[in-house]
């Protein structure tokens, strides 16, 4: 699924490039020539995500499989210009993701269990607030590639952290507040009326997110040492 998303992203970006033919080989009329000279600019983004978990274990047993699904991102952008090559960006948004943990039946050796106990679906809705620095190349006709990186904080609205029911009642609990670092690449494309930006970004949690079950011998959490989110964002920005 992630490969299909990436291929779609690449074809979409290529189609934009083709509509802006001869970008590199010929001087051409510049769209929105003074757009990047504004000290402040605003916009919004829409996109997709694929979230995963990086899990460290206390003992060497069969890994928990993470079944990924495509999620959705939407948010706003505030951009502060430093100079022609550096910008600071704030991108508050809403991120919705879905993952399923699939356990081997070896986790339940000696225990009575049902088939449904082998999976735990984790639906997450984050209020996601990245603070980023954007480093751009020199503008080439109507495009400008860039890299971006920074840190973000996220509030998981569906964490179940304070839920008194744990996995014994079907609830996998996670912490509410998380911190990530982010790294990405993208291309600003200057169209006639606005700037369009496709980008790819990796997000990586800096905190252990799992909340252990009340039972210290729980088959779902007792062997997890750390569990951290990692994910891929594909965003389309309009400014």
Each model region followed by its residue ranges:
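Outer-membrane beta-barrel biogenesis signature
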Residues: 18-43
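Short, solvent-exposed beta-strand-terminating loops
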Residues: 45-47, 98-100, 201-208
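Surface-exposed strand-loop-strand hairpins of Gram-negative outer-membrane beta-barrel proteins
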Residues: 49-73, 77
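Predominantly the C-terminal beta-signal and adjacent terminal strand-loop region
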Residues: 178, 183, 192-239
């Amino acid at each position: 699924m992630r490969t299909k998303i990436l291929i779609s992203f690449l074809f979409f970006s290529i189609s934009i490039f083709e509509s802006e033919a001869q970008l590199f080989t010929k001087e051409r009329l510049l769209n929105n020539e003074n757009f990047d000279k504004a000290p402040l600019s605003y916009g919004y983004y829409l996109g997709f995500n694929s979230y995963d978990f990086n899990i460290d274990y206390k003992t060497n047993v069969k890994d928990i499989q993470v079944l990924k699904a495509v999620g959705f991102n939407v948010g706003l952008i505030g951009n502060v210009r430093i100079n022609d090559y550096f910008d600071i960006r704030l991108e508050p948004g809403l991120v919705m993701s879905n993952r399923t943990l699939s356990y081997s039946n070896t986790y339940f050796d000696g225990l009575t269990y049902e088939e449904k106990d082998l999976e735990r679906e984790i639906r997450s809705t984050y209020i996601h607030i990245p603070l980023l620095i954007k480093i751009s190349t020199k503008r080439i006709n109507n495009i400008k590639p860039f890299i971006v990186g920074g840190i973000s904080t996220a509030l998981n609205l569906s964490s179940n952290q304070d839920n008194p029911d744990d996995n014994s009642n079907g609830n996998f609990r996670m912490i509410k507040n998380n911190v990530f670092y982010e790294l990405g690449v993208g291309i600003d494309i200057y169209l006639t009326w606005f700037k369009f930006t496709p980008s790819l970004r990796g997000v990586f949690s800096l905190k252990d997110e799992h909340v252990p079950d009340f039972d210290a011998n729980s088959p779902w959490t007792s062997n997890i040492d750390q569990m951290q989110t990692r994910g891929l964002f594909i965003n389309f920005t309009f400014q």
